[in-house]
A protein has these predicted regions:
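Autoinhibitory propeptides
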Residues: 29-37, 53-143, 153, 325
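Bacterial N-terminal signal peptides
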Residues: 10-20
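Bacterial N-terminal signal peptides that target proteins for export
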Residues: 1-11
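Short acidic, glycine-rich surface-loop motifs adjacent to enzyme active sites
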Residues: 252-278, 301-302
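Acidic-leg catalytic submotif of subtilisin-like serine proteases
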Residues: 145-193, 200, 205-206, 210, ...
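Extracellular S/T/G-rich loop segment that most often corresponds to the catalytic His/Ser-adjacent loop
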Residues: 168, 318-413, 417, 468, ...
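C-terminal subdomain of the subtilisin-like protease fold in secreted/lumenal serine endopeptidases
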Residues: 35-37, 223, 264-270, 367, ...
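Subtilisin-like serine protease catalytic core
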Residues: 69, 150-185, 191-246, 260-266, ...
Length: 648
């Protein structure tokens, strides 16, 4: 074996050969979809070069020798953000020190302008433009319907002692946040600067207000979820609401490195970009997984790409990092400004699963995100550009009403803060796995207008039930330390608005399912070191490992896992199914619906080649939905639906 210095020299000397002699086929394999498409333009591209494990120093030297300016080093993913000319791309990506290349993609927030009043239900595929007049005085309801529908009208915790790292456009230092913005750093323009809190766009301020803006109905117009929570503001979006993936990764790395200093418990990511590669190689997903392994609960928006230009419901529109297995991926629901859940619907724009390439079931759950009032940044671009979305309170204070999975993500971050305080009070750790499991298990399944339960690709396990989740974690018996012992015993129901709602009692995780009363037991699956993609959990049985030939679970004769899977009478998975390329799921597990929320008659959904460029939206006249055989895929352009404004 060559000594390290000799190997470095060999690597450097070999680069000149690599530049001219890259194997096109293998180099193409190392490029994500965005880079492959970008090559056609012939323009230089911002790239994240991913070094092989242990090759970081070699990669850095190689780039220095070639005179490449490294815009950002990303140690959590072994990445180097650089700009490469079109002719250099394949050579660098093919270099032996690199595992692959990803585009340093533009990330954007996942909010969309609210254009209709929540009390109105437009006809299918239609949007009614009923935005109130600019600065119309908003009459607040006697009780916050947001808190009411979450079951939080009389909750004991407010998120005290919990810190949320808000990775967004910033936070306007409104009195609503008091002295609870503990630190603020700006990651835009390739630098990290400590600054006074600010927000020149306005998106982050709105999300922060939903999480923990201390506003009460007697002196303002809305109520947040966790009024005592602290913030660390990490600005990655500029005044136009755009940022770079590398800046988001640096902010995540900062949160991990400073977790103890700022006591960071939660990261809120109400932003993303289209999925261009499998989760295992996606730099943004890998950074999220690092944060989760560090014990930080990462709450991520699913995206606003759930409907096509013509109003047809589309699937596989989840954005990155919403495809991160450990992330709490949140879709949006419309709670119709009522407390009860019977009229709640999945917001039409909310992105649906499965995730591109991997076929993960996302979102994990949905939460109110439609037409929500929150703090405004008066000097921000949103406030200035969309005056029709301003609402003036009786006190004369202006705020904004926005919609999107950005908003629902903020709501869930607030709920997680409440759970975190509750578990701190009980002296046990709320791990990312346990947080997701509790929220999924206690979620209340939503139904469409016809009374049909939405399938998991649209709502995960259902609408977040803060009261149920809080009740569950506060009733855990912390004296139970032995694995497999029951640590709680309670009825799986929650009363909201004087009505009783059953919990989902399901946990859908990647391509695995937890079913039954598993959450009631102190199990290793809730620990930090468990990667759910490798495990199957069903009822009271746990079998670890990747070998499908040796896994059998359940007490019923009709459940067997081997080379072939027979799941009840409804689903058959055999050797002909290749995850990541073709997937067939029976309709009793996933009920696909068309644009009119009608269930398809066919027994399955088929996904074609997931490496293709596009999504083929559902056809009302077809018996199934097929993705991936055509070049006419549209990545969730809802500009037409929103009157030409596009998504935020």
């Amino acid at each position: 074996m060559l000594p390290p210095n000799s190997r470095l020299v060999v690597a450097l000397l070999s680069l000149s050969a690599l530049v001219g002699l890259a194997d096109t086929a293998s180099a193409q394999d190392k490029l994500d979809r965005a880079l492959r498409e970008g090559q056609r333009s012939g323009k230089a591209q911002r790239v994240i070069l991913k070094a092989k494990p242990g090759y970081d120093a070699w990669a850095r030297k190689l780039l220095e020798q070639r005179g490449k300016n490294v815009d950002a080093e990303l140690p959590s993913v072994g990445g180097f953000a650089v700009e490469l000319a079109a002719g250099e791309l394949e050579a660098y990506c093919h270099a032996s020190v690199f595992d692959g290349c990803s585009e340093d993609s533009i990330v954007r927030p996942t909010a969309a302008p609210a254009k209709k009043k929540p009390s109105q239900t437009p006809a299918p595929n239609k949007v009614i433009n009923t935005a109130p007049a600019t600065n119309a005085v908003y009459s607040a309801p006697a009780v916050s319907t947001l808190l009411g529908t979450l079951g939080l009208t009389a909750y004991d915790f407010g998120g005290s002692g919990v810190t949320v790292a808000l990775i967004d456009s910033g936070i306007h230092p409104s009195p609503a946040f008091g002295n609870r913005i503990k630190a603020f750093y700006d990651f835009t323009n390739g630098r990290i600067r400590q600054r006074t809190a600010s927000d020149d766009y306005g998106h982050g301020t709105h999300v922060a207000g939903l999480i923990g803006g201390r506003q009460y109905l007697q002196d303002a117009e809305f109520q947040c979820v966790a009024p005592s929570v602290n913030f660390v503001g990490l600005k990655v979006l500029d005044r136009n609401g755009a940022g770079r993936t590398s800046d988001v990764i640096r902010a995540i790395e900062f949160a991990i490195a400073n977790k103890a200093l700022f006591k960071i418990d939660i990261i809120n990511l109400s932003l993303g970009h289209p999925i261009f590669e499998p989760a295992a190689t996606d730099p943004l997903v890998r950074a999220v997984e690092k944060a989760s392994k560090a014990g930080i609960i990462v709450v991520v928006s699913a995206g606003n790409h759930g409907v096509g230009k013509d109003g047809e419901i589309g699937f596989a529109g989840t954005t990155s990092p919403g495809n991160a297995p450990s992330a709490l991926t949140v879709g949006a629901s419309d709670h119709k400004a009522t407390i009860t859940r019977d009229d709640d619907r999945v917001a039409v724009y909310s992105s649906n699963g499965p995730t591109w390439y991997d076929g993960f079931v996302k979102p994990d759950f949905v939460a109110p995100g439609h037409f929500l009032a929150s703090e405004a940044a008066p000097q921000g671009a949103l406030f200035k550009t969309y005056p029709q979305l301003r609402k003036r309170g009786k006190s004369g204070k202006d705020f904004m009403q926005l919609s999107g999975t950005s908003m629902s993500t903020g709501v869930v971050s607030g709920v997680v803060a409440l759970l975190k305080q509750a578990t701190n009070h009980k002296h046990f750790m709320l791990t990312p796995n346990l947080a997701k499991g509790v929220l999924q298990y206690t979620a209340i399944p939503l139904e469409d207008e016809a009374g049909n339960v939405y399938n998991p690709l649209r709502q995960g396990t259902g609408g977040v039930n803060a009261l149920g989740a809080g009740t569950l974690v506060t009733n855990i018996d912390t004296t139970v330390s032995s694995p497999n012992q029951a640590w709680l015993n309670m009825a799986p129901v929650t009363v909201i608005g004087h009505q009783q709602y059953l919990w989902s009692k399901n946990i859908v995780w990647g391509d695995n399912i937890v079913w039954g009363e598993t959450i009631y037991y102190n199990l290793p699956i809730w620990a930090l070191n468990i990667v759910w993609g490798d495990n199957i959990v069903w009822g009271d049985n746990i079998v670890w490992g990747d070998d499908a030939d040796n896994i059998v679970w359940g007490n019923d004769d009709n459940i067997v896992w081997g080379n072939n899977i027979v799941w009840g009478d409804n689903i058959v998975w055999g050797d002909n199914i290749v995850w990541g390329n073709n997937i067939v799921w029976g309709d009793h597990l996933l009920r696909p619906v068309d644009a009119l929320n009608r269930a398809f008659n066919d027994d399955n959904i088929v996904w074609g080649n997931l490496d293709d460029d596009n999504i083929v939206w559902g056809n009302n006249d077809d018996d199934n939905i097929v993705w991936g055989n055509d070049d006419n895929i549209v990545w969730g352009n809802i500009a037409a639906l929103l009157g030409g404004r596009g998504s935020w």
